[in-house]
Amino acid sequence: TISLEDYDGEIVVLNSWGQWCAPCRSEADDLQEVHSELQKRKIGTVLGINVRDYNPQVSNDFLEDNGLKYPSIYDPPFKTAAALGGVPTSVVPTTIVLDKQHRPATVFLRSITAKDVMDVVDKLEKE
C-alpha cells in the first residue's frame, strides 16, 4: 500500500492515467522525466493513479513498455479522487502537484509537459 505519508515533507506529483487514454500515453515520458528530476534532487516523486483499466495486466504492461519507474497505484474506480476532494473523476489525465505539506499547488485537467510541472516544482522547492 502506498500512502502520501510515505512522502512526508516531499513534493508529490499525482497523475491519473489509463492505458486507453491517448493523452496519457503522450505525457508518460514527460512524467518519467519529472520523476527522475525529483529523485535526483531528492525532493519528491511522481505517483501514478491508474483509473478505469479493469485488467491489471494491461496497466502493468503499459508501465513496463514505457519504462516508467515511478510508483503507480491501481484504482480503476478512482476512489482516490474522493480522498483528494473536488478532483473530477471524469477528466483523464489529471495531474495534481502537491506541495511539501501535500496541499494542492496546481491542478492540470489536461495532458502536461515536463516543463509545465517543473515550473511549479521549482517554485515549491524554494518555499
Regions found by a protein language model. Give the residues of each.
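A short beta-strand-turn-helix
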Residues: 1-12
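Thiol/disulfide oxidoreductase modules built on the thioredoxin-like
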Residues: 64-69, 75-126
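Aromatic-flanked redox-active Cys/Sec active sites in thiol-based oxidoreductases
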Residues: 15-21
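Hydrophobic beta-strand anchors of alpha/beta hydrolase catalytic cores
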Residues: 13-14, 46
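Structural microenvironment flanking redox-active thiols in thiol-disulfide oxidoreductases
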Residues: 25-66, 76-83
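Second-shell loop/turn segments in exported
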Residues: 20, 48-49, 107, 118
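Solvent-exposed, acidic/flexible segments
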Residues: 10, 23-24, 52, 56, ...
